[in-house]
């Protein structure tokens, strides 16, 4: 039979969680060109008002040289000494294996992608990121800083009891008159103005000028979202229920709900409190507190990285660190130290009388003396509370993760799990609680540390990411995502360096996929293998019809084909067409002059070519033929009549240029016939040669594809290869000028930079291309070839604001150190950057304007399958 359930006679008493948090309202302050948010807190009627502001902080980069570490350490130590008294600041470093933000961005890209093939590649990237997050290899880390401003209550403003009594009587009379509401509003406005002027601005200047940390103030929406996501991670934040707005017009209030904010914060999930853990939103949370610091650190770098080295481990995930500090009273600390010295001295004497040695007493005495010395030398004491929150899905996992963190700290450093008041400390980590961290009604468990010790106990280290979107790399130290965004308004050029089989092409293909998804056209200059295949053969075929792969030995590319500028404004079109004519003149100059041509002749030839280009594009008949050909399109009869190099050659005579040169100053007329003769001779050669016929005939390729790959194959002479490269550059420039943004990828060849004119054109793209929206990517095995191009090569290298260095040969290490100025201990690590077959990733050193970051690139498996170009890999792919 079914057993009967007995009656339960027990009674339980519950307390509303709203009573344990002190949020009164969200605040928005919009003064002096700033838009900041704050939490307005008040624990009870007798306690003062308090505002909590927030910063998003970049922190200190995890990869710094020894000199940079010393500078940063001294800045932090010096800045701590200027912290406002009676206030507290909380550093909150969170490390969660989450990919929600990245998945949302990629999902938006997938939706906007122009073809199913590109969507497929992006879905492969989404799958890889999901895999990395689930295994703990991808762990974004965020550093937020919360600081307080406390406005004293009316009772605390008066020291004498009679003044306090008069103040209470005044408030009572105001209440009787019915003006208490207006008085309360005026007082709130006074509090908010004082908090902004005497609180926020002070903290802002402290971070910017003293600590020299990059910060971004959080507005009311970001603060509300941050608080909501901690308590309700799986639901979308609701509108702020009650909001106070202070601007130049005064104080206003917006009410979107009659239910108080604290009640709505816990509407979706109410935390369940236990002595050892807190259960909220499907996760168990344990609390670990810091009981003692290590005996010391080897150097400043080890001290700064003390907590980072713990949280950056692969085993540590879904963990938060809170460090709250507030200035202590130096006199009280000094008195305490003196008492400890006296106690230690007494204990030592007692031990001597027993003919014994009290080691602990001697150690305490020595440390107390050192602490007093530091205080007299200017060190500032701080009350410090450090807490770790560990989140797991089950209690067994929680116990194991908590033990791991405890074991990572070696004595005398001591971190222990809370087994009695975990719920209370968890509440204290919320920015809407006025209680200090690790303070209780019956005890104050905060420790006192000096300002010279705190840099090792504040979680300030993070991995710097140049951008928030684009190509994603993973930081070698800590698994933090590092993004490179080439699609912002600020142009960036990239240099990718690495030996054969280092993964350059795979990495670049990831950038190209993101470009195609954003409808950004790409032009690539490729040097295929003898069989005609290369990395981008299969890639361009895969993304077809967006991509087209053209073998310049079999196709015709009209050097004089005009760029399509119809989508631009009149001013932009005119400016870009002038740039195109300059570039075309440079191409013609490279075709006419040789390496040994005298400089004075070269100058005259350059002048003649530019004048004739202007005359050519001003001719009405030429313009009409262009119009008809562009209107009819590729392959039409009118297209076959489009102006080419042959037509330009007709303008190369003394009659045509005599009038043009009248306006040119500094022209040596004795050299004009000789220069003109050389121009006609060389251009006639190009018109009749095999390569020349390909560039002086109407184009046979569609130049408006999103991806154009030009393959320089079956070119035996260096001069032919150079000119074909120039023609490809011209086609790339035409494509780029037709769009507001484009990418030009160059797979560097030693032949390319042997010709100064070609190197000069590449340098022009790197120097001025960003203005036209062109992002240049150059891939090479080493920088020697570019560096050997003299000033032009140096100009190219200097404009590569981003550099990725993969695996390099040991013999090339010295050249990287010499050309780029890399410290040997950093660049030498690239010698060991072998592709990891088990983890399917490659290693890269990212150089972003002198900021070094060791990273990994985890390509999507689909992306890797498309661009893999080893013979055995190509054979396997061909089977499918």
Predicted ranges, named:
Residues 18-48, 281-282, 461-497, 507, ...:
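The Walker A/P-loop phosphate-binding site
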Residues 57-59, 95-97, 149-153, 392-394, ...:
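Short, flexible loop/turn elements at secondary-structure junctions
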Residues 69-84, 328, 426-481, 527-529, ...:
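P-loop NTPase motor domains
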Residues 134-136, 486, 494, 570-628, ...:
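P-loop NTPase motor core of the ASCE superfamily
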Residues 348, 478-483, 487-502, 507-514, ...:
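Conserved P-loop NTPase motor cores
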